[in-house]
């Protein structure tokens, strides 16, 4: 391992003597420099994987050893048990299953898969996860129910609000129509007053005479009066 020394200028490697008796000069070391012999060796993924623990996190080795011994014991029992049907068509009944076996099993019958026995720690962890999932589902159902109730309660209020808005729009539209009618009546009545002034000038013997456009305007007096009468009848004006 490389030996470092430190002075006022920083870290350095002291001078060393070669086998032939000559000396190597001291060398300065930059910050972050790692000597070649101290660089960690490369390890492949297979080697890193082999170094990982074989047991699940949190599982005691004693419990895993007991489960392994139990499994090996069952495998030895299964291997020591004689074959059920050593000869095709020959049925052998053992003392422990004579009452249950009444007929030979089909030759192509598939063996039932044995349920995997989990250690107590993994079994408790699985039960806790199932309980958490059930609690999350219950909370989600409650939120959905509350949201549905809130929507049902807000629907009548939305209907009332929409009806009020429609009524306000209708009132505003009616007010605009009434305002337009009043403006039109004022314009027509103003024209009638102007026509009456033109008629007075026509009856007068002195003063300026009306021009051709004013005379044409005076001829429309009856038409304008009829229009005023129709508007007053339709709008309720007096």
UniProtKB/Swiss-Prot annotation:
One example of the protein's molecular function in GO is: RNA binding
Query: Subcellular location, in the record's words?
Result: Cytoplasm; Nucleus
Q: What UniProt keywords are attached to this protein's entry?
A: Coiled coil, Cytoplasm, Nucleus
Q: Which residues form a coiled coil?
A: 176-233
| Compositional bias ranges of the Basic and acidic residues kind | 65-77, 123-133
Q: Provide the GO biological process annotations.
A: exon-exon junction complex disassembly; nuclear-transcribed mRNA catabolic process, nonsense-mediated decay
Purpose of the protein: Regulator of the exon junction complex (EJC), a multiprotein complex that associates immediately upstream of the exon-exon junction on mRNAs and serves as a positional landmarks for the intron exon structure of genes and directs post-transcriptional processes in the cytoplasm such as mRNA export, nonsense-mediated mRNA decay (NMD) or translation.
Query: What is the protein named?
Result: Partner of Y14 and mago
């Amino acid at each position: 391992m490389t030996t470092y020394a430190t002075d006022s200028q920083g870290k350095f490697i002291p001078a060393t003597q070669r086998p032939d008796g000559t000396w190597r000069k001291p060398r300065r070391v930059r910050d972050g420099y790692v000597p070649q012999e101290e660089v960690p060796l490369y390890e492949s993924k297979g080697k890193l994987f082999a170094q990982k623990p074989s047991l699940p996190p949190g599982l005691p080795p004693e419990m895993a050893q007991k489960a392994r011994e139990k499994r090996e014991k069952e495998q030895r029992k299964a291997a020591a048990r004689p074959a059920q049907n050593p000869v095709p068509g020959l049925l052998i009944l053992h003392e422990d299953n004579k009452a249950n076996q009444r007929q030979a099993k089909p030759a192509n019958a598939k063996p039932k898969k044995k349920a995997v026995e989990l250690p107590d720690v993994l079994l408790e962890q699985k039960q806790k996860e199932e309980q958490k999932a059930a609690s999350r589902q219950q909370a989600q159902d409650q939120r959905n129910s509350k949201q549905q109730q809130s929507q049902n309660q807000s629907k009548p209020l939305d209907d009332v609000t929409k009806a009020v808005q429609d009524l306000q729009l209708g009132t505003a539209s009616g007010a605009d129509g009434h305002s337009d009618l009043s403006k039109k009546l004022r314009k027509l009545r103003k024209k009638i007053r102007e026509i009456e002034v033109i008629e007075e000038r026509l009856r007068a013997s002195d003063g300026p005479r009306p021009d051709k456009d004013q005379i044409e305007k005076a001829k429309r007096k009856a038409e304008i009066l009829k229009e005023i009468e129709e508007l007053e009848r339709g709008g309720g004006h007096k």
